[in-house]
Curated annotation (Swiss-Prot):
Belongs to the FMO family. The gene is PC-14. PANTHER family: DIMETHYLANILINE MONOOXYGENASE. Keywords: FAD, Flavoprotein, Monooxygenase, NADP, Oxidoreductase. GO terms for molecular function: flavin adenine dinucleotide binding; N,N-dimethylaniline monooxygenase activity; NADP binding. This is Monooxygenase PC-14. Pathway: Secondary metabolite biosynthesis. InterPro entries: FAD/NAD-bd_sf (IPR036188), Flavin_mOase (IPR000960), Flavin_mOase-like (IPR020946), FMO-like (IPR050346). It is an enzyme of class 1 (oxidoreductase). Coiled coil: none annotated.
């Protein structure tokens, strides 16, 4: 079998690795694979669309692949530079480089008959073709910048997309900076702007609200005393959901919509407890409207550094807030006199370069209009990316048409889309690893059986929403593990010792857990759990962390009991040990 992989980012590299390794785990002949990457090095967006001081918002423990870990176990979040270094090491560790063709642009993918495909590529002006049996599209979500249509955009002296941002120097001297977009990159750039001595003002524009979620469990003060066991090293949020009740033993009637809704209620309650607002973490302004508080709009922004500068003018000073904060309060930075103005989306920019904003009744809109007319000197478009597959013919489906776990379309498993789902809290690379495990087994006819119809891992989709590929990270990873029989049961985990069973039950949904059993079982998985991952359960949870986790577990356990199935119902758990 011959397989082409398009794209040399994390999803492409992990796809290449599993294709090359398949014959070591399954009784099949070696697969011939070529990976085509248009740039001159691997890493994808992390190599070419990142910036100074950029840091991943998903933890190193979650983001790194199951069988190759970051060398420094004390690091929770990798910089973009470190992550590219990690991916380079991944290539070396598994001997991927001989199968990677860099600086090679895929021009066309077409069918040749009998289920095969022809890849046309160009390299240094030379065009060539390669015929294969299957194609893995791993070109990623962040390639073609999305440029909004705003009349008069060219009347701002400096305008560029966030994909071009590299350093705070680009924001200029004594400038009024405007950032369009409230995703992680937009918030990062706003933070760099407001804390730079060179800029005069910073304004962030949003379309219709956003939700801030911390990437670490917040450090808190209880009656004025910091409760964290390790100040500055609070547990990453994406490691904090216990696998036992989040996935393994949650009744089918509680899974999906109800489970996600209840979890979000708990998050909102926790946010109020430590910051005084339910809109988001320390988010006193810019919230989503009530009719938009559904999962299709509810992708957290996990860059929190800018929010204190946005919230400063809006924080409550009521006696209730003062009383609450005197008892328990998240540790927040002192912003001094610096602030970030929040504004509605620009409607147009007039001949004088003055921005005219869309009119609404939001508090931030009223404050901005009262203060001044705004004339930006620098405008950064942190407006995301659009999906584009110019190399695919019309006979091929697109990721949104891939109805089998977002990987392939029914009846056409020879074309797989890896890494095109977006988790609300989580990371794309580990989900790509789980997706490719399923896809490769299907290619070689080694899937245990047909995929069970199950959409409980999907975030609700709103017909008017822009994002249609959202998933709950933990539930999706677990579903993929169930598909291939790699979700370990209690007794299968217990067979590896008490450390493994503790992490299996109370640790996060990390892919190494799914290498204990199943078609991709790996003997090194228990060692990684013991040496690295167990610490996320036993080493860094404060008193408040444990109390909150205990409440959630009691609630989830109660949900299981109250939803106990009738006799003969075999789906309380899908783990078969």
């Amino acid at each position: 079998m011959k397989v082409a992989v398009i794209g040399g980012g994390p999803s492409g590299l992990v796809t290449l690795k599993y294709l090359l390794a398949a014959h070591h785990f399954q009784p099949v002949d070696p697969i011939e694979v070529q990976l085509f990457e248009s740039e001159d090095r691997v890493g994808g967006t992390f190599s070419y669309r990142t910036y100074d001081r950029a840091e991943l918002v998903s933890s190193a423990q979650l983001t790194t692949f199951s069988d190759y870990r970051w060398h420094d176990k004390s690091v929770d979040y990798l910089s973009a530079v470190e992550y590219v270094e990690y991916l380079e090491g991944y290539c070396d560790r598994f001997g991927l480089r001989p199968h990677i063709r860099l600086s090679t642009q895929v021009e066309k993918v077409e069918r040749t008959g009998k289920g095969k495909h022809r890849i046309t590529v160009s390299h240094k002006g030379q065009t060539s073709t390669w015929d294969c049996d299957a194609v893995a599209v791993c070109s990623g979500l962040h390639v073609k910048p999305n440029i909004p249509s705003i009349p008069g955009l060219d009347r701002v002296p400096v305008v560029f997309h966030s994909s071009e941002y590299k350093h705070v120097r680009q924001l200029g001297q004594n400038t009024n900076v405007m950032v369009l977009g409230t995703g992680e990159t937009g918030m990062d750039i706003a933070y760099f702007s407001v804390t730079a001595d060179s800029t005069k003002s910073t304004t962030v524009c949003h379309r219709n609200g956003f939700v801030i979620g911390p990437k670490r469990l917040p450090e808190t003060k209880l009656f004025g005393r910091v409760t964290s066991k390790t100040p500055g090293k609070a547990l990453p949020v994406d490691l904090s959901r216990p696998y036992l009740f989040v996935n393994s033993y949650v009744h089918r009637k509680v899974r999906g919509a109800l489970q996600t809704t209840l979890s979000r209620w708990a998050v909102k309650a926790g946010s109020w407890l430590v910051t005084g607002t339910t809109r988001g973490f320390d988010q006193w302004v810019g919230s989503l409207p009530k009719d938009k508080y559904d999962e299709s709009h509810y992708f957290y922004c996990k860059s929190t550094k800018a929010m204190p500068y946005i919230s400063a003018p809006y924080r409550s000073h009521s006696w209730v807030h003062r009383l609450r904060s005197s008892i328990v309060q998240a540790v927040l930075p002192d912003t001094g006199s610096r602030k970030i103005d929040l504004a509605p989306w620009p409607e147009y920019i007039d001949e004088d370069g003055v921005v005219h904003f869309e009119k609404n009744s939001r508090p931030d809109s009223k404050v901005l209009l009262q203060e001044r007319r705004f004339k930006p000197d620098v405008l950064v478009l942190a407006t995301g990316y659009t999906q584009s597959f110019p190399f695919l013919g019309s006979e091929y489906c697109t990721p949104d048409q891939a109805d089998q776990r977002g990987i392939w379309r029914t009846g056409d498993a020879s074309v797989g889309y890896i890494g095109f789902v977006r988790p609300s809290f989580g990371a794309i690379p580990p989900l790509a690893e789980m997706q490719v495990q399923v896809w490769v087994l299907n290619l070689i006819n080694r899937l245990p059986g047909p995929l069970v119809a199950d959409d409980s891992y999907r975030l609700f989709s709103n017909p008017s929403g822009r994002i249609e590929y959202g998933v709950d990270h933990d539930m999706f990873a677990h579903r993929l593990a169930l598909d291939i029989g790699s979700a370990p049961s209690f007794f299968q985990a217990l067979a590896h010792g008490w450390q493994v069973i503790v992490f299996w039950a109370m640790g996060g949904t990390l892919n190494t857990k799914f290498r204990l059993v199943g078609p991709w079982a790996w003997s090194g998985a228990p060692r990684i759990i013991h040496d690295e991952l167990l610490d996320t359960v036993t080493g860094r949870r404060s008193t408040i962390d444990l109390l909150v986790a205990l409440c959630i577990r009691i609630f989830q356990a109660t949900s299981v009991v109250s939803s106990r199935p009738s006799k003969g119902d075999s789906e309380v758990t899908e783990n078969r040990g």
